[in-house]
A protein has these predicted regions:
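Flexible, polar/low-complexity N-terminal or interdomain linker segments that lie immediately upstream
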Residues: 1-49
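Short active-site oxyanion
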Residues: 32-37, 53-54, 75-77
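Conserved beta-strand scaffold positions in the cores of enzyme catalytic domains, especially
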Residues: 38, 55-57, 101-103
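Residue-level detector of flexible, active-site-proximal loop/helix-junction positions
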Residues: 45, 62-64, 108
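Phosphate- and divalent-cation-binding pockets in alpha/beta enzyme and binding domains
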Residues: 46, 66, 89-90
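Short loop/helix-cap segments at secondary-structure boundaries that form the rim of catalytic
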Residues: 47-53, 94
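Helix-loop module immediately N-terminal to the HCX5R catalytic loop
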Residues: 56-76
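Catalytic cysteine-centered active loop of the rhodanese-like fold, especially the PTP/DSP P-loop
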Residues: 71-109
Length: 111
């Protein structure tokens, strides 16, 4: 009985998390439609294998050194990477520098 409750709880939490990710992707797509800057924080090699059209590539480890590039942008920034983890870290850096951004998750979600 206890295992059944635990499994049900895990399933419910999984569904809630998935809906939250879908919401973030939809919000990111809406921002792109309204003329935002797409920042891809994957490595140059990953970026060259495929990327969202017109996105800017600044790898996460170089972001702090290149923050001025994004400060010149007047548009919100949608940050993407391969799975959303590096994008979340990048958003933290951008927000500390007063740059409006959203974690767009995987760049594949924006296609």
């Amino acid at each position: 009985m206890e295992y059944t409750l635990i499994i049900i709880l895990i399933l419910i939490l999984g569904l809630l998390f998935t809906k939250r990710l879908n919401y973030k992707s939809k919000k990111a797509n809406q921002l792109i439609v309204y003329n935002s800057t797409v920042l891809d924080v994957r490595s140059v090699l990953e970026f060259n294998r495929g990327h969202f059209k017109n996105s800017i590539n600044i790898p996460l480890d170089l972001l702090s050194k290149n923050i001025d590039i994004l400060k010149k942008e007047s548009k919100p920034v949608v940050v993407v990477c391969s799975h959303g983890i590096r994008a979340a870290s990048a958003c933290t850096i951008l927000k500390k520098n007063q740059i409006d951004c959203i974690n767009g998750g995987s760049w594949n979600n924006l296609k």
